[in-house]
Regions:
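Alpha-helical protein-protein interaction scaffolds
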Residues: 1-33, 38
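Lumenal/extracellular ectodomains and adaptor appendage modules
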Residues: 67-68, 75, 88-96, 112-116, ...
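Contiguous beta-strand segments within globular domains
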Residues: 54-89, 126-128
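Acidic, serine/threonine- and proline-rich intrinsically disordered appendage/tail regions
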Residues: 116-130, 135-183
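Short, compositionally biased P/S/T/A/G/V-rich stretches that sit at domain boundaries
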Residues: 30-61
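Compact, basic/aliphatic-enriched, mixed alpha/beta core segments that act as assembly/interaction modules
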Residues: 1-8, 95-97, 103-106, 120-126, ...
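Beta-strand elements of well-folded, non-transmembrane domains
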Residues: 71-79, 90-96, 133-137, 155-157
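Extended low-complexity, serine/threonine- and proline-enriched intrinsically disordered segments
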Residues: 84-115, 148-155
Length: 183
């Protein structure tokens, strides 16, 4: 949550997230404590100079042990976004019994919840990333616990914004500033 967002941006983001994050009896309240992201924001909720940014995240635990992360991504006003030039990286981490943190080997599912994803309405687009815990059949499954996430948004192969919870994961697993061109 970003308490210093302008009221209009906060209202747009809340409206979109409220439609998608109606609580279910099996879910827990969103967690945002210990989240780390870029602290410097302009009046649009974006980092100065960024084309896209994360304006909110919502995290819930599900009854089956999976975790859902809702990510609200906003574009700078009056800039036409080419969705093919945008990449979102979502990394979930686990901790073993010795306290070692590692990238999950479980399948991570992502789904855009607000198609078409084009930022033409000047409202945040919503992405859901789902972490599924290791299957009990996995030999290491009982030794692993969910640790947290790191999210990075890239536009034209350049980092635009990041979020991590706990924040130490971003320090321990820094994202590259630029992605290699896919040409």
């Amino acid at each position: 949550n970003l308490p210093n967002l302008p009221q209009q941006l906060r209202a747009q983001t809340e409206r979109r997230l409220t439609l998608l994050s109606a609580p279910t009896p099996a879910s827990t309240p969103p967690l945002v404590a210990n989240e780390q992201g870029s602290d410097v924001r302009d009046e649009f909720g974006l980092q100065p100079g960024a084309t896209l940014g994360i304006v909110d995240t919502r995290f819930t635990d599900e009854a089956n042990g999976s975790k859902n992360l809702l990510i609200a991504i906003k574009s700078r006003p009056d800039i036409k976004i080419d969705p093919r030039q945008m990449t979102v990286h979502v990394f979930f981490y686990e901790r073993d019994q010795a306290g070692n943190k590692s990238l999950t080997e479980s399948k991570v599912l992502t789904e855009w919840l607000s198609p078409p994803v084009n930022w033409s309405e000047q409202e945040p687009e919503l992405l859901r990333a789902t972490y599924n815990p290791p299957l009990p059949s996995d030999a290491n499954a009982t030794n692993l616990a969910y640790e947290g996430y790191v999210v990075g948004i890239y536009y034209n192969n350049e980092i635009q914004d990041t979020r991590a919870n706990p924040g130490s994961l971003a320090d321990d697993n820094p994202l590259p500033l630029y992605l290699k061109s896919q040409t």
